[in-house]
Structures are given as C-alpha cells and as structure tokens.
Regions:
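Structural motif
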Residues: 4-16
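Short, acidic Ser/Thr/Gly-rich low-complexity loop/linker segments typical of extracellular
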Residues: 14-19, 24-43
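Short Pro-Gly-centered beta-turn/loop motif in secreted/extracellular proteins
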Residues: 39-49, 55
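A short, solvent-exposed loop/turn motif at the edges and junctions
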Residues: 51-63
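Extracellular beta-sheet/turn segments enriched in Thr/Pro/Gly and aliphatic residues
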Residues: 66-83
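Aromatic-Pro/Gly-enriched surface loop or interdomain linker
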Residues: 104-133, 178-315
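Helical hinge/lid and interdomain linker segments adjacent to catalytic or ligand-binding clefts
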Residues: 134-149, 154-159, 164, 277-365, ...
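An acidic, glycine-rich "communication" segment
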Residues: 216, 220, 359-476
Length: 523
C-alpha cells in the first residue's frame, strides 16, 4: 500500500477513522484514515474525486491526484469541526463602511452586533440565520496550508458599520446555546476627538492559530505530517520555544487575516471589571477593552483604529494630539514606526505606550489581507536590541524602552523612583511607594508590571527619564519613563508592561497616573 493523503482538522491535528470514498469515474474505492491521519491504499494512478466524512466534522469533497511513477508529496485534506466560528471581512473599517459576516455553524444561529466600551452595549440584532439546503450553514476550509491565503468563506449577511466608532464584536449563539464571538474595529470616518487609540490587530493575527499556524506554532510552515501529540511532534516543545523563530526571515510563510480568531473572543456576558480568564485574552482584545472601558468611564473621548489604518494612512496623526498604544503591540511595519517617530520628533505628537513588548518585530503588509513576519530572533549578545532594530530601527529610540526576557512570565507592583514628576501629581506618592497591586490579569496575576516587560537601552533618547520600576524578580521590572523630543514639543510616556491595561480599572495608582498623562497630553 502507498500513502495517498493526510487528513487533519482546522488546527492541523490528525484525524483518524475518516471515511474516504475515492472515485475516478470508473471505480469507487473506500478507505479510512489511520491514527496518524494518513490514508493508505492501492489506488491506480489517476485523478480522484474524494468524499470525506466523520462524525463531529462537516463532510466535504476534494480532489487527489495519484501519480503513475515515483513518490509524490501526499495531499493534505482538511476537515472543519462542527464548533461554530466566524469573522467579519474586512476586520476593520470606518463608520458607514460595510462588513461581510461569514459564519460556520451546523445549526441555526443568532447574530448580535455589540460595542465594547464602558460596558458591552448592543448596537443591533442582525437576525437569525438558517438555510433551505441541508446543513447549508456549514462552511468548508481549503485543503493544504490555507493560513497564508485565508478560508474564503461565503457571506451570510452584510452589515453597515455604526456611526459611533469603537471596538465591536459580532456575537454568535446557536439554537442549542453554543457561542462564538469575533472582533470588528470601527474607526471614525473623520476624527471626533483629540485622542487616537490603536488596536493591536497585528498581534491578534500573530497569535491566531486557526488553520494550524500562527507566529508561535509552526511559524515558518506546516510540518510534513499532521500533529498527533503536540509535545512529542513539535520542535516548540521538544527543543524549546526559540525553535519557532530560529529560521531566517525568508523561511516564514505569510499569515492571512481572513480567518476566524478562536483565541480572541469576548463573552457576551462579560463586563470590563471581570477578571480576564484564559491564556490569550489577557493580552489580546479583551485586555485592550479594559483600557477602552476605563477611558470612556473617565470621560476621555477617543477614536479607535486598527494598526492597518496607521500603516496605510487612514489614521492621520496630524489630526490628533495623542496616540495611545496598549497591552501588546508587538508587530509593526516600518511605515508605522516611521510615521509615529516623525510625528513625535518633528511635529509635536504625544505618544502614550501603555503596554509591553511593543514594536519588537517588523511586519510587511503584502496586501490588505496578509502579513509577512520578519520574525527571526536576534542572536543573544548581538549588536541589535531586538528584531525591529535588526531589520529597521531600535524600538527604544521611539518608546524609550525595549522588551527584554528578564521578568517574563512574572508580575509585580511598581516602586516610585521620582515622585516629583507631574505624572504622579495628586497621588501623594513618595519615593519608594508601591502602586499597581490590583490586577484583572488571571494568567499572570501579581501587579501592573508584568507578563512581558520593557526597560531602557543604549538607544533610548538622552531625555529618557525614569519614573518608576517594577518589582519583578531578577531585575525584570518594567520601567516607566517619560521622554521629550529634541525639537517640536513631542513627548513619549511609556509603562513597558502588558499587564497595565488589566489594572487600570481596579488599581487607583495605575488609574491616577494614566489620568494625569492623558489630561496633560490632550490639553
């Protein structure tokens, strides 16, 4: 018997016991996949129509070519589980724009558009959806590696973006109560405030493993065979996480935004003051929502944009006084970096960096739907502070701080270094006082300096002034800094910590400092 093909699911996990019907127009052969997901058989050379079915997955028809001579690379046939999923395309727009809602569900479902601001506020009911054909609400995924090209699902309904900008989610609930939610960033058609906030949409993509690849699992390409057991099959677990980012930049296949984001959901019953549950929500959109909710509650009007809006110029920085980036804005294009740098250092812009491990790695927008990550790790002890420095310019030259691995995976409060700085006005803090104790971050609890932290570096501008330091072990505390541009009046305030956003609603010190900086920068 020869290997004909492999069968795997949307995470590239091997599927055993899949019924496979091979039809060449003359004869029909019935085979089943092995525990490894491999399908073996004695098929004559030719082109076959293949029908696949297994309980818990949508049935599908594909094509397989069996060559006459010599070994051939076996096809990878992909099935989609019956868990509901969906996305809006494109995933960002401006007020009045149109989004295509694309949903996969094995049963009828209800869609609601919700704006996640000070609270979760229903914008409108999009309706109940079903189809006349049997299981016509079930989608399929392409065969092979579709992470660079997207899934190409059929549209269920078109939705017009509301006039009020912000972080929106479409919430899906099936007839039996299964749920899924997916983000839609709605920017204003024209500025409505002096404060712009950037959603970290490139990071959302980097962590999206739908299809079996992200920038953290099978980062360069899918392996030759589907995964049976991740910890024994994948180099990430066998030899360490650094394996994912050891190949040269040109080895990494692109990643498409046009896929569902199972790791980036917000629950329909979730409130911004709820603890943030789970590994990924603590640093993706759910954590960013906590900062947006706090800003609205405090009366700081703002306009939300996707990172693509900064890259392509939809976000005109010169129409704003303040730009806020938060939580985990790790992946920027050089166009994004250069635009913000020039705005701060030449035209007086005020940048608030309320996150950690930011602007660490360069990405290239291949088109409106696809990113290529220049993700090869910098050699320890090398001449560059990080990947962005290697491929473009130093992160600390823009933010005043840069991510280092010290303190990674820990969280702690901050200790005040310079209580006389205006960022601490009205707090009553003295040198050595501690703040940033309370946190909603359940993955890494412990304080506002945490998860991943940034510190000053040789490329930090000379004006970079230290205000507070995280109390993380082994010198891993985040450094809060303020710097001023040499000309033009531009300023940067950086906290250097992913967990800051998860603390602002529940920790008075974090809230007071954030409020002081926003008021001063926006005035």
């Amino acid at each position: 018997m020869r290997l004909i093909c492999h069968v795997s699911d949307e995470r590239f996990a091997a599927l055993a016991d899949v019924a496979c019907e091979f039809d060449d127009g003359v004869t029909v052969t019935l085979l089943r996949s092995a525990p490894s997901g491999a399908v073996y058989g004695d098929l004559p050379a030719g082109r076959y129509r293949v029908t696949l079915a297994r309980d818990g997955f949508g049935a599908k028809r594909s094509e397989v070519v069996v060559p006459a001579d010599g070994p051939a690379e076996p096809a990878h046939l992909r099935l989609l589980s019956e868990r509901p999923a969906g996305y809006v395309w494109p995933k960002w727009t401006t007020s009045g724009g149109t989004g295509s809602v694309r949903v996969h569900s094995p049963e009828p479902y209800r869609l609601t558009l919700v704006r996640h601001g000070a609270e979760a506020e229903e914008v409108r009911l999009l309706g109940w959806f079903d189809e006349h054909g049997p299981r016509a609400t079930v989608q399929v995924t392409p065969d092979g590696d579709y992470t660079p090209s997207g899934v190409g699902w059929a549209q269920q309904v078109a939705v017009t973006a509301p006039e009020r900008a912000g972080l929106h989610y479409v919430h899906l609930e099936t007839e039996s109560g299964a749920r899924f939610s997916f983000p839609w960033v709605v920017a204003p058609a024209a500025p409505t405030s002096s404060i712009a906030v950037l959603a970290s949409t490139n990071s959302w993509l980097a962590y999206n493993n739908f299809g079996g690849r992200s920038n953290y699992i099978n980062a360069a390409e899918l392996p030759e065979r589907p995964i049976v057991h991740a910890r024994t099959d994948l180099d990430r677990y066998r030899t360490g996480t650094s394996t994912e980012h050891s190949p040269p930049d040109e080895r990494y296949r692109p990643l498409s935004f046009e896929r569902p984001e199972p790791l980036n959901q917000i629950g329909i019953d979730e409130h911004p003051t709820d603890p943030i549950r789970g590994r990924q929500p603590c640093h993706l959109a759910a954590a960013e929502w906590r900062l947006l909710a706090w800003m609205e509650r405090e009366g700081f009007a703002h306009d939300l944009y996707a990172e693509a809006h900064l890259h392509d110029g939809t976000l005109d920085l010169d129409r704003y006084r303040v730009l806020v980036i938060s939580t985990h804005p790790e992946y920027w294009s050089r166009q994004m970096y250069d635009a913000v740098y020039a705005w701060v250092h030449e035209r007086g812009g005020k940048l608030m960096y309320l996150g950690g491990n930011g602007v660490d790695c360069e990405v290239e927008f291949l088109d409106d739907a696809t990113l290529r990550f220049r993700t090869q790790d910098e050699e320890p002890g090398g001449p560059h502070e990080n990947r962005m420095h290697r491929s473009h310019r130093p992160t600390s030259g823009l933010l005043g701080v840069v991510f280092t691995h010290a303190g990674e995976g820990t969280a702690a409060p901050y200790r005040v270094v310079d209580p006389e700085h205006w960022a601490f006005a009205g707090t009553g803090f003295a040198a050595g006082d501690v703040f940033g104790v309370e946190s909603l971050h359940e993955r890494i609890p412990g304080g506002a300096s945490g998860h991943e932290t940034d510190k000053r570096a040789p490329s930090s501008p000379p004006s970079t002034h230290l205000l507070a330091t995280g109390m993380n072990p082994d010198g891993g505390g985040a450094e809060i800094v303020h710097l001023t541009a040499e000309s033009g009046g531009g300023e940067v305030f950086s906290v250097g910590s992913i967990t800051w956003s998860a603390c602002v609603l529940v920790d008075k010190g974090v809230a007071d400092v954030t409020r002081n900086v926003l008021r001063r920068f926006a005035s």
